[in-house]
Amino acid sequence: MLSRLFRMHGLFVASHPWEVIVGTVTLTICMMSMNMFTGNNKICGWNYECPKFEEDVLSSDIIILTITRCIAILYIYFQFQNLRQLGSKYILGIAGLFTIFSSFVFSTVVIHFLDKELTGLNEALPFFLLLIDLSRASTLAKFALSSNSQDEVRENIARGMAILGPTFTLDALVECLVIGVGTMSGVRQLEIMCCFGCMSVLANYFVFMTFFPACVSLVLELSRESREGRPIWQLSHFARVLEEEENKPNPVTQRVKMIMSLGLVLVHAHSRWIADPSPQNSTADTSKVSLGLDENVSKRIEPSVSLWQFYLSKMISMDIEQVITLSLALLLAVKYIFFEQTETESTLSLKNPITSPVVTQKKVPDNCCRREPMLVRNNQKCDSVEEETGINRERKVEVIKPLVAETDTPNRATFVVGNSSLLDTSSVLVTQEPEIELPREPRPNEECLQILGNAEKGAKFLSDAEIIQLVNAKHIPAYKLETLMETHERGVSIRRQLLSKKLSEPSSLQYLPYRDYNYSLVMGACCENVIGYMPIPVGVAGPLCLDEKEFQVPMATTEGCLVASTNRGCRAIGLGGGASSRVLADGMTRGPVVRLPRACDSAEVKAWLETSEGFAVIKEAFDSTSRFARLQKLHTSIAGRNLYIRFQSRSGDAMGMNMISKGTEKALSKLHEYFPEMQILAVSGNYCTDKKPAAINWIEGRGKSVVCEAVIPAKVVREVLKTTTEAMIEVNINKNLVGSAMAGSIGGYNAHAANIVTAIYIACGQDAAQNVGSSNCITLMEASGPTNEDLYISCTMPSIEIGTVGGGTNLLPQQACLQMLGVQGACKDNPGENARQLARIVCGTVMAGELSLMAALAAGHLVKSHMIHNRSKINLQDLQGACTKKTA
């Protein structure tokens, strides 16, 4: 119960950082203002003399106070020194903010407690610094730093608050009760010190629960820009260190603390209210007397300077003990900043070699090393490189010997996703990293697990062989390799090594690239158990003149003639004055299936859903799940006791399946409240219908419904398309209409719409499987113009399932293709416009492809063009493959 409350609190604070920070700062400033402008107007040393205070100053307490200050500074120094070992400047910065703001809040409370007397801060601040604990603050920061995105930052902060919040609350309560015992000692100086301690604990707790998590969230949001995709503050090795089980409190310790708290509460109650009910010895009065604030011993004087000058002079004036303290602080600061940074960076480097490599080029002998996948990491390498480094370490480009004979592999395919200028065919790129000596023989599993769980070491202190050993022993799940390694690429590399040993041909993966790819955008979003990426040729067709705009359309395909043919269609459309398009409907669908006790009950639910009241109830529940999802209509059908409900809703610039599914689930829960006997069988009952041929998509539409048209002049038909209008119309009727009807096609009244749709989908990061429904298209042609020699063509596509955010559109190469079309990401001015524009481009490009292919068929050029452009001229017998191998 408490964990849930703290989780909700942490999620709220992390989701609204500006509001929380402004609120806490405003509250603190208001408290400071109340201290300055209200309350007692007697200020010791300015308008009143405090003779007793002078006596206290001359006492031997100065030595003790100076020692206390020095110890406090050393304590803070060692805490920050420990934080530096974690290797993150963000933890240091956030911890510094925590310390500064906590000190500010504490100072405000102390000034209020001392009735505007600043002198008491000299005694109070050392006790505050001694009681401040940066370990919990840094732990919460590490929860946030283990995130891959801003949304995950908020979730991890909430999870951290759920784990740390109850423990910190109980610890703060126990500390206050224990330190508070000193306020009942009767010794005035001890009472004041204990009051300072209690205020220190409360100030720390207040800042930790409000300002600090909001500040962490805001700092990481402002610094979320990344190089090569990974957030610059993301530290993946924290993910395994901060498992919830390791941070959960010991239940025995918690029970002891609770029992202790109850006992201390009884002690305080007995001492304050039963044994001595009189308020004479209150701590506030005692502190005032001890600091010379008693009205009876104070004498009024005339101020010689203004109040702010008085405070400024007291801050500037320094005694010998303050000089000692300040000197120690400055010396430690200089040592920490200038002398320890180099030492720390030489022993620990947590920088991601993908995000910020320092690259040098080293010449190596020809044919000595190959840039290809490896089976054993760093055990086989060039002597020249080994002599240079003398160690085993991770490289930007790993150097190993080929897996097959060098004579069989004279050439190697090289693929780079990123800056290709860093590659040199005659050199090997080596990332300069701190030297980490790894043993040649794998160490025992127990020792490897200890290194893996050490926050200061981690996976980069283990060799690939040791990681594989841990995977085989089931200590590391194979699917978690990317999150546990210091880089995602190394996790992919190790998985390839594991897989290669299980394949009949160990060198099968040598032509499947995996290096220089931003896997941080893939993990948790696009693919699992990654072993590489598939480079697909991307061509461009265009310019496509559509709606008085020109588009260069990217197409990823391995089918020859496709891009060239589409490009010819684009040219014909452009010479004819361009094409026009309209979006007829926009609504993604999800069709769950529910069951009721009887068919008549299903009919009653269907009738209720068709009423305005029922639709309004369901729409309210559905729309509450997203700021983009807006339920448009419901389409219901009955099959016996089963009721199929087709939800149709807009989804902004997202394709929308996940968004609509979430709304559908909430709507079904609301429907269940009205019909408790209803049983939800599946959130998808194939009534959507997704990734399957279905007449309902062809008739009702799904996603974006688009129509596109163009008029091609007779001259362009003859000179560019090399045929006649009459011939194209004849082929279109008998092929696309009659032929498809004879085949019983559903939505397939076209020549090859799926070709263009799939090529654009792959290039632009769409779900390629959705070409099944998205390729529904009817192509119509007819004669037009004054002499009926011009060609009018139209393509109607009622179910284009497409989006510009989410899924594969987050990958950088796919984003580049979307940027070519000017539709990358979400449209801020008109949500959903980018996705609709992309759907119009798809329809227009399909029309261009239809135009060119139909012309080729009418002219009899299809086979001839494919023989020229779609046949490989390479002698396959010269290549080594699964079925055709050269004999020895």
Swiss-Prot record:
It is linked to Muscular dystrophy, limb-girdle, autosomal recessive 28: An autosomal recessive form of limb girdle muscular dystrophy, a group of genetically heterogeneous muscular disorders that share proximal muscle weakness as the major attribute. Most limb girdle muscular dystrophies present with elevated creatinine kinase and myopathic electromyographic features. Disease is usually progressive to a variable degree, ranging from minor disability to complete inability to ambulate, and can involve the large proximal muscles, as well as axial and facial muscles. Homotetramer. Homodimer. Interacts (via its SSD) with INSIG1; the interaction, accelerated by sterols, leads to the recruitment of HMGCR to AMFR/gp78 for its ubiquitination by the sterol-mediated ERAD pathway. Interacts with UBIAD1. Changing residue 515 to T: In LGMDR28; uncertain significance. The active site is at 559 (charge relay system), 691 (charge relay system), 767 (charge relay system), 866 (proton donor). Pathway: Metabolic intermediate biosynthesis; (R)-mevalonate biosynthesis; (R)-mevalonate from acetyl-CoA: step 3/3. It catalyses: (R)-mevalonate + 2 NADP(+) + CoA = (3S)-3-hydroxy-3-methylglutaryl-CoA + 2 NADPH + 2 H(+). Regulated by a negative feedback mechanism through sterols and non-sterol metabolites derived from mevalonate. Phosphorylation at Ser-872 down-regulates the catalytic activity. Inhibited by statins, a class of hypolipidemic agents used as pharmaceuticals to lower cholesterol levels in individuals at risk from cardiovascular disease due to hypercholesterolemia. Inhibition of HMGCR in the liver stimulates the LDL-receptors, which results in an increased clearance of LDL from the bloodstream and a decrease in blood cholesterol levels. It comes from the Eukaryota. The keyword ATP-binding does not apply. The chain crosses the membrane at residues 10-39, 57-78, 90-114, 124-149, 160-187, 192-220, 249-275, 315-339. This is 3-hydroxy-3-methylglutaryl-coenzyme A reductase. It comes from Homo sapiens. A motif (INSIG-binding motif) lies at residues 75-78. Keywords: Cholesterol biosynthesis, Cholesterol metabolism, Disease variant, Endoplasmic reticulum, Glycoprotein, Isopeptide bond, Limb-girdle muscular dystrophy, Lipid biosynthesis, Lipid metabolism, Membrane, NADP, Oxidoreductase, Peroxisome, Phosphoprotein, Steroid biosynthesis, Steroid metabolism, Sterol biosynthesis, Sterol metabolism, Transmembrane, Transmembrane helix, Ubl conjugation. InterPro entries: HMG_CoA_Rdtase, HMG_CoA_Rdtase_cat_sf, HMG_CoA_Rdtase_CS, HMG_CoA_Rdtase_eu_arc, HMG_CoA_Rdtase_metazoan, HMG_CoA_Rdtase_N, HMG_CoA_Rdtase_NAD(P)-bd_sf, HMG_CoA_Rdtase_sub-bd_dom_sf. There is a cross-link at residues 89, 248 (Glycyl lysine isopeptide (Lys-Gly) (interchain with G-Cter in ubiquitin)). Catalyzes the conversion of (3S)-hydroxy-3-methylglutaryl-CoA (HMG-CoA) to mevalonic acid, the rate-limiting step in the synthesis of cholesterol and other isoprenoids, thus plays a critical role in cellular cholesterol homeostasis. HMGCR is the main target of statins, a class of cholesterol-lowering drugs. It is a multi-pass membrane protein. It is found in: Endoplasmic reticulum membrane; Peroxisome membrane.
